């Protein structure tokens, strides 16, 4: 049995020993101060995060997927990052996948014992057809979750690039992966509650991986999300704003170009900047593998 008391995420924080006696302002102030350690901890592992981004770009370019998997809060964070990619970057929902121990119902309610299975993640990987072109990213704050360990072992056996994200140095999951990302954020404000600093660190890292990989495959022009999907009125206006910002055109011109481009802001931008008709602009974009700069 693993001695949890030896894990930093399970030790008591000396700065919050009187947590139950603090005023609301004192409590939120100490939490805010402790969160500064998260930023510092993530900064220390940026080279490893950058490596994960490079691998993710390579996987996407090879037709593979980014597959996050974890249990509890860690699994929920992976799902959260995955589901934001289609509306933000215009990708299919199966390009960035989030798996949580206990399946979708575990997102809103804990499924007891699901994380303790070494075989469960392998079964789920087989259901989605995990293959060597995919990058498998296991997330476990403690770094010892059997669900994640089993998933990493199976992914490695297929030849996938494997990444482990944990908040304890020298973690068990880190030893199972080709790349370990292990930010040191210190003990939690509330002892063992890894939804706090550990969860924040994991979310920051996942933000970097998904954003960096999508930028790497041409889903941004300058700092504009040019593949945004117009799924509601707000996003229709945003697509117009993005087109205007990228080209300097008027709102009317942006709306007209977007209509001709079937709502594709990236295509509308290339049309406006090159003064090409839609078919020629589309061919330019395809030749540039979806990169706006390459099409100009």
Describe each PLM feature range.
Residues 1-41, 45:
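Cofactor-/ligand-binding subdomain signature composed of acidic, glycine-rich
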Residues 30-38, 98-109, 221, 262:
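Gly-rich Lys/Arg/Thr-decorated short loops/hinges at beta-loop-alpha junctions or inter-strand turns
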Residues 44-59:
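A short, well-structured juxtamembrane/interface segment
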Residues 61-62, 157:
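Residues at the C-terminal ends
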Residues 67-204, 213-217:
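Glycine-rich phosphate-binding loops that contact phosphosugars or nucleotide phosphates
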Residues 213-296:
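Short, amphipathic alpha-helical interaction segments embedded in low-complexity terminal/linker regions
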